[in-house]
Amino acid sequence: MSENSTAENQLGTEPIGRLLVRMSLPMIISFFIQALYNIVDSIFVSRISENALTAVSLAFPMQMAAHAIAVGLSVGLNARVPEAIGAKDEIRANRIAGTAIFLSFVSMLVFMAAGFLFTTAVYKHQTDVAEIIDGGSAYLRILWTVSAGEFFGQLLEKMLLCAGCPLSAMLSQACGAVFNIIFDPLLIFGIGIFPRLGITGAAWATVGGQIAAALLALIMNLKHNHLIHLQPSDFRPDISSCKDVLSVGFPSMVTIGLSSLSNYLINQILLSYSTTATAVYGIWAKLQNFCYMPVFGMNNGMVPILSYNLSAHHPDRVKKTFHMAWVFILLLQVCLMVILECIPASLLSLFNASESMKAIGIQALHICLLSLPFGGMTIIMTTAMQSLRHSHYALIANILRQFINLYFFTALLSALTHDLSIVWRAVPIAELASFITAFLLMRSMFNHLHLSEDDAHRF
């Protein structure tokens, strides 16, 4: 049996529990490591000053704009390539991969130009504190202009997943995270032979880690990927391949892009209270990102299985895969919520929090952490919608979750109460509303896929 057939048979015949663990666990670990270095980055920056932490917090929505495009294109590849392979269409699979790479290259050039032209203006629009403007614009400029590792690393890792090589994808992401964690303090504080770069040192460590991960993923693909064989002609995009990638990837772009916009607008609301409130929200965003990394890891393992088995007409495997992923994420998010609810002061101490920051932050974390189970389940449901050819459902749910609900409830509670302690309640309220919407859309999707009503109630 050929290596191609073996990789395909694993997606179509291996027991679902074992397959989901094998495909997802390495990615969950690597995403955890990735989230850890995002937190470590902020921890080290907080040692510079609270203004430096605020500058990084204000950069986060802008940083996620590039991440949104990179993730969206990689999600499109991750869903459509296994689907083409399941349909025995290798030519289409290669064209989809080549088109995703081309679109990533164009996106990288756009953000490179934005990095040179707009970063200072972005910060001046948000604050008049010179330290925040200077440090933040320099930080963001590096992240945008040196974004090759972000864009190509995401795609190359998803290509490894499509080929049934999750361990290789995990190693490449772990390599980038370890690079960042090691070089963060060296470049921020000027340890040993390294220059003291302050906040820009954190940016250089981040892009260096992304490039290291992308290079290792490239090497792994050349050695282990036996399903995707790219030719120069595959990099010439065509309308059909662009539709294949974007029909699945666009909802993910919208999800993260609207999250960036929502964070930006919420930061403006919080700045009306204090810069400390904005710094606290930045800490929550990093902690939330850390807690959702297992969800994203599970998604990466789940998507190829769902797409392949839908295309190969194995509905029972589709249902069982989704059910197991959904239950696992629910249990994990509840556990994380309970653990973190017990240690908010300790979490804030990691970020060198002042007493005024702790006074705001402890209350904020207690409230915001309640949102984790609802958010985790919603993310799994919307990802399944994308994989199962219901991207329009995912788009609706993501727009509500990432932008409309969160910003609406934050703005509403702020306008009605002018009380910061009440404004934080917008986070769990928005996640609950989004979960209800996604659940109703999911039931409708099951009916469209000719799944029974019992199956819909089961989930």
Model-derived regions, located:
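Interfacial/gating helices of multi-pass transporter permease domains
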Residues: 44-64, 96, 131-135, 199-200, ...
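Short alpha-helical transmembrane segments in multi-pass integral membrane proteins
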Residues: 1-24, 81-148, 194-250, 306-371, ...
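Helix-terminus/linker motif at the lipid-water interface of multi-pass membrane proteins
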Residues: 32, 36-54, 123-130, 186-197, ...
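Small-residue-rich hydrophobic transmembrane alpha-helices
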Residues: 53-116, 150-169, 280-338, 342-344, ...
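Transmembrane helical elements of multi-pass membrane transporters/channels
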Residues: 22-41, 142, 153, 176, ...
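Hydrophobic transmembrane alpha-helices of multi-pass small-molecule transporters
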Residues: 65-68, 180-185, 214-218, 290-293, ...
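Residue-level signal for short hydrophobic patches within transmembrane helices
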Residues: 13, 17-36, 40, 62-69, ...
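Short runs within selected transmembrane alpha-helices of multi-pass transporters and secretion channels
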Residues: 74, 78, 143-162, 169-177, ...
